[in-house]
C-alpha cells in the first residue's frame, strides 16, 4: 500500500485520502454482485473539512449496467453525493467524532431497491517537524488505477481516491523554486515516463508560476503568490511515455493560496456627511460609514471593527454619538442637540481588521461630518399689528400692502418660510397673499376687480405660519395675526353694454332704412353726471348705422345671408360707447344679427365642366347643384333640359338620381368630339321655388377602353417626354406643309381650268339645268336688293366673303390680291350700266388687271337643257352686242336680272 502525502515546508504534512478495495487473498476474481463492493469506506484527511472539498469516491457495482441509482447521505447538512459517487463537504467544519461517521444510500430509481454503505473519516495526527522534513522526500501523488471490466466481471485494482487541495501561504519568501509535491505513476517501474502540468499558472496565463520536473515529477512554485490576485489554482497533471502516448488519465491538483494580513482597511469615502435634526432623542440613527479590506473576509484578516477616536466640538457632551463596531452605524447617545448653539460636529472614525485587535490588526481612519438640521421651534411673528394700503378701483394684479414677519429659525428652510392666508374681511375672494421667497414678506395682491361704488374700504384679517408645523413641546402659538386696511380710490370707469354680445334674429333681404334694435350702454360711475355717445367701430359689410344719442341701429343696405362677411348665419358688428369724463372712457359692444334665410339664390350646376366619350356606352356625367341658400330653400333639386334648342334634348338626356344628384348621358349613338355647352334647368325646393338655367361645358372626346379621354392635350398633360412632344410637333409641321402644297397645286389647276373655259364659245355654253345651293326652304322673299353695295367692290368687309365651300370657277379668289387703282364710284346706285361701262374702261386700260372682267364663266351643269345658260358680260372692246333676251325664259327667280339687262333701250 502506498501512502499519499504532500505539503509545502511551512505547513503541516498533507496526507492524501486513501481508499483501498479489499481483494481476495488468492487474487481470484469473484462473481459480480449488485451493491457496494465495500462494507466500509475510509478516508484519512490531513486537515479539517472545507466547504466543497471532495472527500472520497464510492462505487456501486451495477452488474447488468441497466440500473440507475440515486445516492443520498444520512447527513445531508454536512455531506452530499454526486451521480458518479463523489462525496463532497456541504460546509466547513472541524473533523470530530460526531462528523467522522455517516451512511451513504443508493436507491434504484425504478424498483426503489435500496443499498447502504458506511463511511469513516479520520484525521491524521500531526507529525513532528523533523518527521515532516524526512517525509517530504517521499511525499508523492500517485496516479490512480481504474477498475477494469473483464467478461462481465469486475477485476479490482487500486481503489479510486481524491487528492486534497494543496495550501500555500501568500507572500512566501522562498527560497524559490519551492518544492510542493512529487507526482508519479506506478508504471514508472516498467516504462520511462515524462510528467507535465497544465492550467492557469503553468502553461496558461499567468504562466511559469508552477513548474514540474518531467523526469522526477517534482512540482514546484517559482515566485511568491498573492491571494488578492488569484486565490486558487486548478492544475492538471499528465503522465506520458517517451513517445508521447498517454499512460495515465490526467489528475486534478488544486492549490489554495492562504491569506495573510497584508492589506489595511480602506474607507469608501475619506469624508462622510450626515445630518441629524436638532433636539433628536438618544438612539436616533444618523449615518453609516463603510470600509473594505482586500484580505479574506471570512478570516480574521478581513474582519473589521469600527470606533470613534474623537468628537469636535465636545459640547454639550464629549460623547454625543456612538458607532456600531461591526456595521458602522452612527447614532446619538445624548440629548441636547441645538442648531442655534452647535451647527456641525466632526468625528474621526477608525476601522481595524483582526476583529479590532490593536496589537495585530491594521487600521485606517476617516472623517464623519454631522450637520445639525433645523426644526420649526420658532413661529413667524408680524412686525406690526396693522398694515395699510390703497388701490384704484378695477385694478387687478397690483400689490396694495407688504406684510413683514420675523422668524428665528434657519432662513430659507421649511421652518422659516412663511405662509400667509386671509382669515376674514374678504368673503368674495378679491385679495390674495403671496410670499416673497427672498424676504419672506407677504404681498397683498388684488385678484378680482374692486368697485368703488360698491365698497370704498376693506379691512382684512391675515395670519402667518410656517410651511411645517411647530415641533412638539414648543410653547409658542403656531401662528401670528394682523390687520390690513385697504382704501379704494374712485376712477372713471368704462361704459359697458348689457347684454354683450346682443343677439337679434332678422330675415335677410331687409331694405335700407329698417330699424333693427336699440343697443345702449350703461355708465358704472353713478356719482358722476356723464353723457354717452355711440359710434360704429366695426361693420365689415357697411350695412348698419347707429344713432349717436339713443343707440338706435338702422340698416343702410340690404342684408344678405350669403355674404362672405356672414359666418354661420351670424353677422357681427361692433359699436363704441364713450363718456365725457376725465379722462374719457369707452367700452365696446358686439351686435350679432342672426340672419334667417330666404329663397333668393337660384341653384347652379356643379361641376361646371366635364368630359364625356363620343359613344354613349359607357358614358355618364354625375352632376349636382350648388345653392347658397340653406334648407328648406335648397335641396332637393329638380333637374331638366330646356326645350330649345331642339338639339339639346335630341343629343342629351338627364336622369335624377336623388334630391341632390343627377346623371347626364348621351342620347344619340355618336357625337362628334368638341366642346358643347349644355343648358340644365335646376329648381330648388324653396317657397316659392327658384329655377335657373345653368350651363355645363361638356368636352366630348375619343376614349380608350377604360372610358378615359385620349386627346392630345390629355396625353401631353399625362407627362409625355420632351422627345415625344418634339416628334409630334414635327409630324404636325410636315402635315401642314403637305396641305399647303396640295392647296397650291389645286389653285394652279383651277387657273388652268379657268383658262380653258374662257375659250368656250358663249353660244355653245348652254346649261341644262341650274343647281340650287344652300336651299333652306322657299324663295327669296325680299326682292329689294341693295345695289349700293356695288359702288365700292374693293371695300367689301371680310365678313361678306363667302365661306369656304362649293365655289364657282369664275368667282374671284378669296386670298389677297395686288392693290389696283381705285375705280371711281357710280354716280348713282341705280345707274348700274354707267358703273359697269366705267369699270370696263378702267380694266381695259389697266395692264395688271386679270381677265376676269372679259368673260365670266359659270360651272358647266350639263347640256341639252331647254333653258339657256347665263352669258358673260362683254366689255365694249370685245366686239358686238350681247343678247340678254333669253333671261326672260328662266322664270320668276331671274326676273330682276332680266329687267336689268334685257331692255334694249336701257
UniProtKB/Swiss-Prot annotation:
Modified residues (Phosphoserine): 96, 135
List of residues binding Ca(2+) 1: 170, 226, 228, 262
Entries under CDD domains matching the protein: Cadherin_repeat (cd11304)
Signal peptide region: 1-25
One GO cellular component term: cell junction
Swiss-Prot/TrEMBL keywords: Calcium, Cell adhesion, Cell junction, Cell membrane, Cleavage on pair of basic residues, Glycoprotein, Membrane, Metal-binding, Phosphoprotein, Repeat, Signal, Transmembrane, Transmembrane helix
Residue ranges crossing the lipid bilayer per the database entry: 725-746
InterPro entries referenced in this protein's UniProt entry, alphabetically: Cadherin, Cadherin-like_dom, Cadherin-like_sf, Cadherin_CS, Cadherin_pro_dom, Cadherin_Y-type_LIR, Catenin-bd_sf
Chain sites annotated for binding Ca(2+) 2: 170, 228, 259-260, 262, 295
Cellular localization per UniProt: Cell membrane; Cell membrane, Sarcolemma; Cell junction; Cell surface
Membrane topology: Single-pass type I membrane protein
Positions bound to Ca(2+) 3: 261, 263, 293, 301, 353
Segments on the Cytoplasmic face: 747-906
Glycosylated residues in this chain: 190, 273, 325, 357, 402, 572, 622, 651, 692
Prodomain residues: 26-159
Molecular function as annotated in GO: beta-catenin binding; cadherin binding; calcium ion binding
Function: Calcium-dependent cell adhesion protein; preferentially mediates homotypic cell-cell adhesion by dimerization with a CDH2 chain from another cell. Cadherins may thus contribute to the sorting of heterogeneous cell types. Acts as a regulator of neural stem cells quiescence by mediating anchorage of neural stem cells to ependymocytes in the adult subependymal zone: upon cleavage by MMP24, CDH2-mediated anchorage is affected, leading to modulate neural stem cell quiescence.
Subunit architecture: Homodimer (via extracellular region). Can also form heterodimers with other cadherins (via extracellular region). Dimerization occurs in trans, i.e. with a cadherin chain from another cell. Interacts with CDCP1. Interacts with PCDH8; this complex may also include TAOK2. The interaction with PCDH8 may lead to internalization through TAOK2/p38 MAPK pathway. Identified in a complex containing FGFR4, NCAM1, CDH2, PLCG1, FRS2, SRC, SHC1, GAP43 and CTTN. May interact with OBSCN (via protein kinase domain 2). Interacts with FBXO45.
Protein name, as recorded: Cadherin-2
Amino acid at each position: 500500500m502506498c501512502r499519499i502525502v504532500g505539503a509545502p515546508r511551512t505547513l503541516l504534512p498533507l496526507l492524501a485520502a486513501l481508499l483501498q478495495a479489499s481483494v481476495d487473498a488468492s487474487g481470484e476474481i469473484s462473481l459480480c454482485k449488485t451493491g457496494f463492493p465495500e462494507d466500509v469506506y475510509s478516508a484519512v484527511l490531513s486537515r479539517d473539512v472545507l466547504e466543497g472539498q471532495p472527500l472520497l469516491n464510492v462505487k456501486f457495482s451495477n452488474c447488468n449496467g441497466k440500473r440507475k441509482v440515486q445516492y443520498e447521505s444520512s447527513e445531508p447538512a454536512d455531506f452530499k453525493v454526486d451521480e458518479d459517487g463523489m462525496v463532497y463537504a456541504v460546509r466547513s467544519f472541524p473533523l470530530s467524532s460526531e462528523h467522522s461517521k455517516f451512511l451513504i444510500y443508493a436507491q434504484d430509481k425504478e424498483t426503489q431497491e435500496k443499498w447502504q454503505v458506511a463511511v469513516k473519516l479520520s484525521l491524521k495526527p500531526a507529525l513532528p517537524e523533523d518527521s515532516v522534513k524526512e517525509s517530504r522526500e517521499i511525499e508523492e501523488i500517485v496516479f490512480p488505477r481504474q477498475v477494469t471490466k473483464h467478461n462481465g466481471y469486475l477485476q479490482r485494482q487500486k481503489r479510486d481516491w481524491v487528492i486534497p487541495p494543496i495550501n500555500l501561504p501568500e507572500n512566501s519568501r522562498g527560497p524559490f523554486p519551492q518544492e510542493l509535491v512529487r507526482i508519479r505513476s506506478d508504471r514508472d517501474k516498467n516504462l520511462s515516463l515524462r510528467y507535465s502540468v497544465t492550467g492557469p499558472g503553468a502553461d496558461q496565463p499567468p504562466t511559469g508560476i508552477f513548474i514540474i520536473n518531467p523526469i522526477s515529477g517534482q512540482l514546484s512554485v517559482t515566485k511568491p503568490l498573492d491571494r488578492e490576485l488569484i486565490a486558487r489554482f486548478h492544475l492538471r497533471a499528465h503522465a506520458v511515455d517517451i513517445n508521447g502516448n498517454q499512460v495515465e488519465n490526467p489528475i486534478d491538483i488544486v492549490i489554495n493560496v492562504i491569506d495573510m494580513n497584508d492589506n489595511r482597511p480602506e474607507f469608501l469615502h475619506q469624508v462622510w456627511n450626515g445630518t441629524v435634526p436638532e433636539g433628536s432623542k438618544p438612539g436616533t440613527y444618523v449615518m453609516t460609514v463603510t470600509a473594505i479590506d482586500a484580505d479574506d473576509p471570512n478570516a480574521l484578516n478581513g474582519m473589521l471593527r469600527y470606533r470613534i477616536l474623537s468628537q469636535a466640538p465636545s459640547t454639550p457632551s464629549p460623547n454625543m454619538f456612538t458607532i456600531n463596531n461591526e456595521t458602522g452605524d452612527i447614532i446619538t447617545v445624548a440629548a441636547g442637540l441645538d442648531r442655534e448653539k452647535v451647527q456641525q460636529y466632526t468625528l474621526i472614525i477608525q476601522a481595524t481588521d483582526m476583529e479590532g485587535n490593536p496589537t495585530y490588526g491594521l487600521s485606517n481612519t476617516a472623517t464623519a461630518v454631522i450637520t445639525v438640521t433645523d426644526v420649526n421651534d420658532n413661529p413667524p411673528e408680524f412686525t406690526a399689528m396693522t398694515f395699510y394700503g390703497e388701490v384704484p378701483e378695477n385694478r387687478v394684479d397690483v400689490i396694495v400692502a407688504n406684510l413683514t414677519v420675523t422668524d428665528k429659525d434657519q432662513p430659507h428652510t421649511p421652518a422659516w418660510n412663511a405662509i400667509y392666508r386671509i382669515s376674514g374681511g374678504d368673503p368674495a375672494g378679491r385679495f390674495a397673499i403671496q410670499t416673497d421667497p427672498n424676504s419672506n414678506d407677504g404681498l397683498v395682491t388684488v385678484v378680482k376687480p374692486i368697485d368703488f361704488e360698491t365698497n370704498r374700504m376693506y379691512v382684512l384679517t391675515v395670519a402667518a405660519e410656517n410651511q411645517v408645523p411647530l415641533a412638539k413641546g414648543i410653547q409658542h402659538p403656531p401662528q401670528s395675526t394682523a390687520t390690513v386696511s385697504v382704501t379704494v380710490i374712485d376712477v372713471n370707469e368704462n361704459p359697458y353694454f348689457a347684454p354683450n354680445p346682443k343677439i337679434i334674429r332678422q330675415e335677410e333681404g331687409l331694405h335700407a332704412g329698417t330699424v333693427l334694435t336699440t343697443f345702449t350702454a350703461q355708465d358704472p360711475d353713478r356719482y358722476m353726471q356723464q353723457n354717452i355717445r355711440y359710434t360704429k367701430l366695426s361693420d365689415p359689410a357697411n350695412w348698419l348705422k347707429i344713432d349717436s344719442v339713443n343707440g338706435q341701429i338702422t340698416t343702410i343696405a340690404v342684408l344678405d345671408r350669403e355674404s362672405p362677411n356672414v359666418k354661420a348665419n351670424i353677422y357681427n358688428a361692433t359699436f363704441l360707447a364713450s363718456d365725457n369724463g376725465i379722462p374719457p372712457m369707452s367700452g365696446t359692444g358686439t351686435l350679432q344679427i342672426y340672419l334667417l334665410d330666404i329663397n333668393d339664390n337660384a341653384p347652379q350646376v356643379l361641376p361646371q365642366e366635364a368630359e364625356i366619350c363620343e359613344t354613349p356606352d359607357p358614358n355618364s356625367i354625375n352632376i349636382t347643384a350648388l345653392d347658397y341658400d340653406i334648407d328648406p330653400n335648397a335641396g332637393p333639386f329638380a333637374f331638366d333640359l330646356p326645350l330649345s334648342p331642339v338639339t339639346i334634348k335630341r343629343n342629351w338626356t338627364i336622369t335624377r338620381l336623388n334630391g341632390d344628384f343627377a346623371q347626364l348621358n348621351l342620347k344619340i349613338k355618336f357625337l362628334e368630339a368638341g366642346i358643347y355647352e349644355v343648358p340644365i334647368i335646376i329648381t330648388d325646393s324653396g317657397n316659392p321655388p327658384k329655377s335657373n338655367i345653368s350651363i355645363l361645358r361638356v368636352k366630348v372626346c375619343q376614349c380608350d377602353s377604360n372610358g378615359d379621354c385620349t386627346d392630345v392635350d390629355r396625353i401631353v398633360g399625362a407627362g409625355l417626354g420632351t422627345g415625344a412632344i418634339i416628334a409630334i410637333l414635327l409630324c404636325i409641321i410636315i402635315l401642314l406643309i403637305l396641305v399647303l402644297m396640295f392647296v397650291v397645286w389645286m389653285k394652279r389647276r383651277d387657273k388652268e381650268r379657268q383658262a380653258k373655259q374662257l375659250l368656250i364659245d358663249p353660244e355653245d355654253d348652254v346649261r341644262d339645268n341650274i343647281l340650287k345651293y344652300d336651299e333652306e326652304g322657299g324663295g327669296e322673299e325680299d326682292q329689294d336688293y341693295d345695289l349700293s353695295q356695288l359702288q365700292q367692290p374693293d371695300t367689301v368687309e371680310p365678313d361678306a366673303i363667302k365661306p369656304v365651300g362649293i365655289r364657282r370657277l369664275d368667282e374671284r379668289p378669296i386670298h389677297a390680291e395686288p392693290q389696283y387703282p381705285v375705280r371711281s364710284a357710280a354716280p348713282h346706285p341705280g345707274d348700274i350700266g354707267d358703273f359697269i361701262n366705267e369699270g370696263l374702261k378702267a380694266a381695259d386700260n389697266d395692264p395688271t388687271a386679270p381677265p376676269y372682267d372679259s368673260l365670266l364663266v359659270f360651272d358647266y351643269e350639263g347640256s341639252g337643257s331647254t333653258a339657256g345658260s347665263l352669258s358673260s358680260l362683254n366689255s365694249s372692246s370685245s366686239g358686238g352686242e350681247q343678247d340678254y333676251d333669253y333671261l326672260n325664259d328662266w322664270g320668276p327667280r331671274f326676273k330682276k336680272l332680266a329687267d336689268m339687262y334685257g331692255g334694249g333701250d336701257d
